[in-house]
């Protein structure tokens, strides 16, 4: 925040201590009350247009406001009229309030922009069918885009190089709660052998759009691919089991030299009593 802004607001709040008596003379005043000052900066197109607004609130009711577009304090209720008139008579307060557009808003924008509006995170793109794909059978193809920032993103579907628009559905950007977004764009399809579906993602964090393809295959090709994956995983499991057995077996042997010949001699591990 600008160096002069905090003392200025504090001074106004201290000045508001007279509010309890001036606003409630001749009325039943509450024993407890709350006075608040809330400052907001509104930016349009970066810092091209900046608006600084301070709201003064008494017991949840806004009664005086300073708006940099107006350039003065405005009473929003009858009870706020005395304070607005007094503060508008203070030329130093008016000038400091008007300067807050640069001293507070633009200053804080420059400090926060690198990790807020300037922050960019590239998306991860995955394409998969909703159900096991079969030729000539209606299905839904998902393009899942996750972990991107900012939330503005363009996702398109193509079939054999031609953009598909009529059968496209989207969840829209969903906030993850960690300053990233996710979305799923779905395409209704009836795959034919040789069809190539492409999800094209364009985002400000990318130097060029990212495309992920999904190709329609015959049932035989699909089952063959699944069988290949299963065989690979099974072979990997057997390999790991073999390595573990070999490592355990080697723990019970040492290698020594006898008469120039290398032999292996079993070594019994000590047993506890």
From Swiss-Prot:
Glycosylation sites per record = 45
Membrane topology type: Single-pass type I membrane protein
Provide the alphabetized UniProt keywords: Adaptive immunity, Disulfide bond, Endosome, Glycoprotein, Immunity, Lysosome, Membrane, MHC II, Signal, Transmembrane, Transmembrane helix
Q: Which cysteines are joined by disulfide bonds?
A: 41-105, 143-199
Q: Where is this region: Beta-1?
A: 27-120
Cellular component terms (Gene Ontology): late endosome membrane; lysosomal membrane; MHC class II protein complex
Region called Connecting peptide, residue ranges: 215-224
Query: What residue ranges lie in the Extracellular compartment?
Result: 27-224
Annotated InterPro entries: Ig-like_dom, Ig-like_dom_sf, Ig-like_fold, Ig/MHC_CS, Ig_C1-set, MHC/Immunoglobulin, MHC_I/II-like_Ag-recog, MHC_II_a/b_N
A GO molecular function assigned to this protein is:
peptide antigen binding
Q: Where is the signal peptide?
A: 1-26
- What's a BP term from Gene Ontology annotated to this protein? antigen processing and presentation of exogenous peptide antigen via MHC class II
Quaternary data: Heterodimer of an alpha chain (DOA) and a beta chain (DOB). Forms a heterotetrameric complex with an HLA-DM molecule during intracellular transport in endosomal/lysosomal compartments in B-cells.
Its biological function? Important modulator in the HLA class II restricted antigen presentation pathway by interaction with the HLA-DM molecule in B-cells. Modifies peptide exchange activity of HLA-DM.
- Report what the protein is called: Patr class II histocompatibility antigen, DO beta chain
